[in-house]
Design a protein with these regions (language model features):
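C-terminal cap of thioredoxin/glutaredoxin-like
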Residues: 35-130
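Structural alpha/beta surface segment adjacent to cysteine/selenocysteine redox centers
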Residues: 1-40
Length: 130
């Protein structure tokens, strides 16, 4: 993992796309997240560029699904959902990235900052990651 030359990026598009994927294709959410992560942090691809994000999603989604993901990501409801999630993160005390709000099997929740090396793992259930 290395920081790409073009970092930082405006990550709104990939975040909104993941929000749509989580809602519409929940069984593929984690794999799509990892695909996007790998594209940027391992392969140096700028996933904020729509064409690059589309290519990143194509192995896991049909061409029609990718078109729907990208178009829905720019729609008002998904823009608002990301705004709401960002507000919730700030209200919970988030002050940087990565910020994870983790819930264990007993329902106990706890925030973690800068602990991305722990996620995603099978033992953690991420309720909110910003």
């Amino acid at each position: 993992v290395k920081t790409p030359d073009f970092f930082p990026i405006l990550s709104l598009l990939p975040q909104r796309a993941l929000g749509f994927i989580k809602e519409q294709y929940p069984q593929r959410f984690i794999s799509a997240f990892l695909d996007i992560f790998d594209a940027m942090w391992k392969n140096g691809k700028d996933v904020s560029v729509p064409e690059t994000l589309a290519k990143t999603l194509q192995p896991r989604f049909s061409s029609e699904e990718v078109k729907t993901i990208l178009s829905s990501s720019s729609s008002a409801p998904y823009k608002q959902r990301l705004n709401d999630a960002t507000k919730e993160a700030l209200d919970r005390g988030a002050f940087g990235c990565p910020w994870f709000w983790v819930r264990n099997a007993e329902g106990t929740e706890e925030p973690f900052f800068g602990s991305d090396r722990y996620a995603p793992t099978p033992s953690l259930s991420l309720s909110t990651a910003v």
